[in-house]
UniProtKB/Swiss-Prot annotation:
Family membership noted in the UniProt record: Belongs to the TRAFAC class TrmE-Era-EngA-EngB-Septin-like GTPase superfamily. TrmE GTPase family.
Species per Swiss-Prot/TrEMBL record: Cupriavidus metallidurans (strain ATCC 43123 / DSM 2839 / NBRC 102507 / CH34) (Ralstonia metallidurans)
PROSITE patterns recorded: G_TRME (PS51709)
Binding sites annotated in the UniProt record for Mg(2+): S234, T255
Protein name: tRNA modification GTPase MnmE
InterPro entries registered for this protein in UniProt: G_TrmE, GTP-bd, GTP-bd_TrmE_N, GTPase_MnmE, MnmE_dom2, MnmE_helical, P-loop_NTPase, Small_GTP-bd
Cellular compartments annotated: Cytoplasm
Chain ranges of the TrmE-type G domain: 220-397
EC identifiers of the protein: 3.6.-.-
Length: 475
């Protein structure tokens, strides 16, 4: 038997107790399981309330049974779904009974994601839609769930297919010019091939922009709170989270280890990490280890908020220690990850200090040369917290109220960027016309391959295995 000819079964609902639990069976000849467990054949696509029977005819449970003939099912195969009471013992008994009834047809327990993988292999959905199924299940915000649902409905795939069709059309023109060089008609000039390529690149840029937004919804951002001891990092974490997660005292070095909390800003998950204060003279070994872990968190951060005491900053400007922290942050952060100075405790700061500027009101100072963006707040009173949220969204390029976004993964962004690079090379080769038509055609082909990898039309088995094994068992 091939994989598609072997029937599979699994508990499709989450582990634990619940009002309803579902056992799903998919594959050829599941009618044998249906008749054994349900006691009779079922009318296709109709829910039937009946007892589920063991091998001796004793009742395991009462529930709903649904039978979907191929190809009109989730997997494209015959599917039987048994909906009973959601206790773990009952569900395991029902699954065991299905496996027992299906032993003659080779029924086995499904691997993680195998139902959805079969749906993909049977053309019930493409790879981007299949990934969206898992993303919908794992969505951590309402906005992420809505975007995953749009991807599952095919919004992302439609955008990719539209790009691929345009690339194919342009490839046809280039191939025609290569195959019939003696023709008097210049296919590329007659069809404005360069204009077509420009429009394709513009369309791709639009899809990539939407995909970046979707990636923010799915992945969220890692935001590290860093700075010297006792500058209000834990207070800021509590203010952003809306609860007292971290211990706050006037004693420097209170936070010894990282404290992590996930919050939402406009639907984007922000993973806020409070860290040990940064100083050279750690009080003890525990604090030293905490500082090392701070720098480890910084090396994986998307944004670092460098907190600075407002009163000291107004009186003396950036201190030598904070300037050194900024320099080290620049060297430790991943490329493209911004540093934001958060000037905290403005409620305790004078209106005008020795440096000649005021700081007892919330405001933002835009980045200027080597100086990063500054946000002036009071974590204790909450002044400026909403301003900070808005500024963080601006810094990451988030478009508020972007209801049209679809969810995207890192591999999608990589594929889109690779396609973008090949289209750029295609445009460069097009300027050489006849001398580089072969190169022009090849770059278009490579761009098409990268786009097709998103929907699974050109995808390695290794990638498929990686994607589907991350699903839950019953999906």
């Amino acid at each position: 038997m091939t994989v598609s000819q072997i029937p599979i079964a699994a508990i499709a609902t989450a582990p634990g107790r619940g009002g309803i639990g579902v056992v799903r069976v998919s594959g050829p000849d599941v009618g044998a399981v249906m008749r054994a467990v349900c006691g009779r054949a079922l009318q296709p696509r109709h829910a039937t309330y009946l007892p589920f029977l063991d091998a001796r005819g004793n009742v395991i449970d009462h529930g709903l049974a649904l039978y979907f003939p191929a190809p009109n099912s989730y997997t494209g195969e015959e599917v039987l779904e048994l909906q009973g009471h959601g206790g773990p013992v009952v569900m395991q008994m029902l699954l065991s009974r299905c496996l027992e009834a299906g032993k003659d047809i080779g029924l086995r327990v499904a691997e993680p994601g195998e139902f959805t993988r079969r749906a993909f292999l049977n053309d019930k959905l493409d790879l981007a839609q299949a990934e969206a199924v898992a993303d919908l299940i794992e969505a951590s915000t309402e906005a992420a769930a809505r975007s995953a649902a749009r991807s599952m409905e095919g919004e992302f795939s439609k955008a990719i297919h539209a790009l691929v069709e345009k690339v194919i059309h342009l490839r046809m023109l280039v191939e025609a010019t290569l195959d019939f060089p003696e023709e008097e008609i210049d296919f590329l000039e007659a069809s404005n091939a360069r204009g077509q390529l420009t429009r394709i690149r513009e369309d791709l840029a639009g899809v990539l922009k939407q995909a970046r937004q979707g990636s923010l919804l799915r992945e969220g951002l890692s935001v590290v709170l860093a700075g010297q001891p006792n500058v209000g990092k834990s207070s800021l974490l509590n203010a952003l989270a809306g609860s007292d997660l971290a211990i706050v005292t006037p004693i420097a070095g209170t936070t010894r280890d990282r404290v992590r909390e996930t919050i939402q800003i406009d639907g984007i998950p922000l993973h806020i990490i409070d860290t040990a204060g940064l100083r050279d003279d750690a009080a003890d070994e525990v604090e030293r280890i905490g500082i090392e872990r701070t720098w480890e968190a910084i090396r994986h951060a998307d944004i670092v908020l460098h907190l600075i005491d407002a009163a000291d900053y107004i009186e003396h400007g950036i201190s030598e220690t904070d300037d050194h922290i900024d320099d080290r942050l620049s060297g430790q952060l991943p490329p493209g990850s911004p540093i934001v100075r958060v000037i905290n405790k403005i409620d305790l700061a004078p209106s005008v200090g020795a440096m000649g500027f005021g700081g007892n009101r919330p405001h933002v100072v835009a980045a200027n040369g080597p100086n990063p963006t500054e946000i002036w707040i009071s974590a204790r009173t909450g002044a400026g917290i909403d301003l900070m949220r808005s500024e963080l969204l601006r810094l990451i390029g988030w478009q508020s109220g972007n209801e049209g976004a679809f969810l995207a993964r890192e591999r999608h962004l990589i594929a889109l960027r690779n396609a973008e690079s090949h289209l750029e090379l295609a445009e460069a080769s097009a300027s050489q016309h006849a001398q580089a038509l072969d190169l022009f055609a090849e770059e278009l082909r490579l761009a098409q391959d990268h786009l097709n990898s998103i929907t699974g039309e050109f995808t390695s088995d290794d990638l498929l295995g990686t994607i589907f094994t991350r699903f839950c068992i019953g999906k």
